[in-house]
Structure formats: structure tokens, C-alpha cells
């Protein structure tokens, strides 16, 4: 059985490394990129089963909600489940994110990093 493939988009180097390492140790195949602006090139190279997207990117970067909207404009990308990572807590508009196809929202910091792996497996197509 092929492992679930994940595209992880996280700007914080340490967090990106920890999340990628945790998911890989659990048997998931992870491609990790630091900027949301790189997501479209990464998707053209191969479609993941799940996208894990940090909603809050640094100022001047493509923002998470904009990425979600663009993902839904391309037929090949529209059905890819997206797990949002957000330090914004209740500020995240859950109606908007659901409409944009978000499968799950996890708050940051994650106290139990294995929760990410469980969530990715649960939403994988």
C-alpha cells in the first residue's frame, strides 16, 4: 500500500522540520516547502493526497486564504483535502474556510504533534 503523500507549507524552519519528521516517522510521505508562493509549482510537480497549510505566513507573502481560493480555481487541485494550521484561534472564519474546502483546522502551537498525523490520515482521500 502506498503511503499518504503530504505537501506541508510552513514558514517556520523549526516547526516545518518537526512536523515533517513526525509525519515521516509515522509512515507518511512529506514534501515540505517554506512559502505559500511555492505551493503552485509544487502541485505542478505532483499532487499530494493532503495539503497542510500554515494560514499565517509572513508579511509580504501569499496568504493562506488567498492560497485556498486559488486552489479551488483549478480542477485538478479542487478536491485535495486541506488541513489548516492557525495560531489565530477563533479568529479563523470557519464558514469561509469550509466553503473553500478546508477539511480540518488545527490550532498552533500543537501541544500533541501526533494530532497532525492523525488528522492527515483522517482526511486523506
Describe each model-derived feature in a short phrase:
Residues 41, 63-78:
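Short amphipathic alpha-helix used as the core "switch/output" element in two-component signaling
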Residues 17-25:
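Charged docking surfaces used in two-component/phosphorelay signaling
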Residues 62, 66, 89-106, 110, ...:
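Alpha4 helix (beta4-alpha4-beta5 surface) of REC/receiver domains from two-component response regulators
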Residues 47-49, 76-81:
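His-Asp phosphorelay/catalytic-motif detector in bacterial-type signaling
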Residues 46-57:
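Active-site beta3 strand of CheY-like receiver
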Residues 10:
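Conserved acidic carboxylate
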Residues 27-36, 42:
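Short hydrophobic/Thr-rich beta-strand motif most characteristic of the beta2 strand and flanking loop
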